[in-house]
Amino acid sequence: QQENDPSESKLDLSLCAQRLLLMGCEYVLITGTHENTQQVRNTLFASSGIIRTDDWERLEHTYHGSGCTLASAIAASLANGLSVSDSVLEAQDYTWHTLQAGFRPGMGQYIPNRLFWANDEEDSEDEHEEKEVIIEQPEN
């Protein structure tokens, strides 16, 4: 098999997940963010096998904070009572949208916009345009 053969990669990732599960983890989520593919494939494993596999459109930039965003979103979903499988799906969806709305504050990687849902249509058209804010003082 070739070095970049997807079937070999999937087998290797399954073995990695099984090793982590044998060390005491209940679940292992392996993400495909660093693969050279058009889709990002994330797979959730348990001792019983694969729980779910989700494919996401690969975005064009590189990001700093995507893994932290995903882990935090999973934890928040679990804390709100969702099942592990549903938490992973919801967190992936949230994370993908934060990346899609991400921004580049300087010359480095893009940063997830974790408040993407709070942006209105005008803000998303030109995020860098300065907005004039007028605060009216109450009359005494």
What name fits each language-model region?
Residues T31, G67, S87:
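Residue-level signal for inorganic ion chemistry
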Residues I50-R52, S77-A91:
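Phosphate-handling active-site elements
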Residues S85-N140:
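Charged C-terminal helix
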Residues H61-V84:
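Short, small-residue alpha-helix embedded
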Residues Q1-I51:
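Conserved phosphate/ATP/ADP-binding segment of small-molecule kinases
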Residues G32-N36, E57-E60, Q92-T95:
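Glycine-rich beta-alpha junction loops
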Residues I50-H64:
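Short pre-catalytic strand/loop immediately N-terminal to key active-site residues, enriched for Gly-Thr
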